[in-house]
């Protein structure tokens, strides 16, 4: 058993070692590509080629996404979006290749998706996806069910009127024979069949017009959603630009991270004691942790997103329900049989002369036939007319529903990863502007040094006041408490980034 256990542990150790080795080998080219992409001026031909290749790839990706957004999702025609996306891709390539801050701004927009503006963009795109694909599909299936009902109603009405007409024809052909027997046979329909048909047609048209109104509202909502999505996208880029501007102009902005570069700088200066008791606002980037308040805020916002997921699930369920309803209605209408009807009318008229004498003589009566007629009438009962087209049920848009749900789940994930997104933005900006990051680290080191000197000064004050305590007991404690929490950190809390 010990041998098997040792062999298993050895295999797990080798597997973990090879896994780490593979990860390290995979990270090396990624680090080289990131270094080339973040360089303002490439240092070699390899970095230049890598930078151009990345710029072309990103420009193609942006152009492809824009074309998909304009054509496939937002229902634009095929002509203008192709030209617009081509010009957009060329502009993005030139901007990324020639202007390094634009590259930084583009990369900063990725972690900015974890902010409130990014969540709004994701949720807006999700709602647009549902409005384009799922809602019209639901309305189309409900309209198909209404069209089936209209066809069956019209066919049943025509069959009823046709039956009445055939009975009237039978009564008309039996007219001479029935008049010979001093009786008449008539069939009438109370009311006008044309008026009833017109009334049913009017009701059906009103129902279809109601659904057309809903489709118009859906298209109007789609147009509004296009504008809102564009505004959110501009807001996302604007927030990234605002962060980059504050990073480059304000040394105190978002300067609350104990990075590895800061640790090395303090070690070189022999000031590692500044991190022995760090202030509460200093964040360790190597081991980021969320506070209790941040976790509670995430849970509350996740509850709101859960309600949105429930609404999306109800919409998708409505899509499936409308599809099943339309499918069942169309299948039921197609299976309605054509009922053949044959009406055979036989009419015999006879009379008897002095039948009471034959009755007294116990003789059978003698009947004289003076009129006899037999007719057959054939027609069919059709519940669906020939000229009525039965529409096909539209299957649910599974891909659109999954995409909308995935975007909403991604928006929920950004709530938890929001704190890490802020750290990632700082890391990205530091990679593109190392000189500015060096100035910011020097400012942070000076800030920590001032706080440490002030703490040492406060620690020396109780000893001084202790010499006077014999004359005025409690005076030292009151002097320390009178300085308030500002005495521990006169610089105050960091900037509130939200």
UniProtKB/Swiss-Prot annotation:
Describe the outcome of a gene knockout: Mice show a lack of multi-nuclear osteoclast and foreign body giant cell formation and a bone-resorbing efficiency reduction.
Which keywords appear in this protein's UniProt record, sorted alphabetically? Answer: Differentiation, Membrane, Transmembrane, Transmembrane helix
Q: GO terms for CC? A: membrane
Q: Where in the cell is it found?
A: Membrane
**Residues annotated as transmembrane:** 52-72, 82-102, 122-142, 227-247, 304-324, 402-422
One of its GO biological process terms is:
cellular response to estrogen stimulus
InterPro entries per the record?
Answer: CSR-E3_Ligase_Protein, DC_STAMP-like
* Tissues expressing this chain: Expressed in osteoclast (at protein level). Ubiquitous. Highly expressed in multi-nuclear osteoclast cells compared to mono-nuclear macrophages. Expressed in foreign body giant cells (FBGCs).
Reported induction: Up-regulated during osteoclast and foreign body giant cells (FBGCs) differentiation by TNFSF11 and cytokines. Down-regulated by estrogen.
What is the topology of this protein in the membrane according to its UniProt annotation? Answer: Multi-pass membrane protein
Q: Which domain of life is it from?
A: Eukaryota
- Topological domains on the Cytoplasmic side lie at 1-51, 103-121, 248-303, 423-498
Q: What segment(s) does the record annotate as region Disordered?
A: 449-498
For the keyword Coiled coil, the answer is no
Q: Which residues lie on this side of the membrane: Extracellular?
A: 73-81, 143-226, 325-401
Which intervals carry biased composition (Polar residues)? 476-485
Q: What does this protein do?
A: Probable cell surface receptor that plays a role in cellular fusion and cell differentiation. Cooperates with DCSTAMP in modulating cell-cell fusion in both osteoclasts and foreign body giant cells (FBGCs). Involved in osteoclast bone resorption. Promotes osteoclast differentiation and may play a role in the multinucleated osteoclast maturation.
Return the protein name: Osteoclast stimulatory transmembrane protein
Q: Which organism is it from?
A: Mus musculus
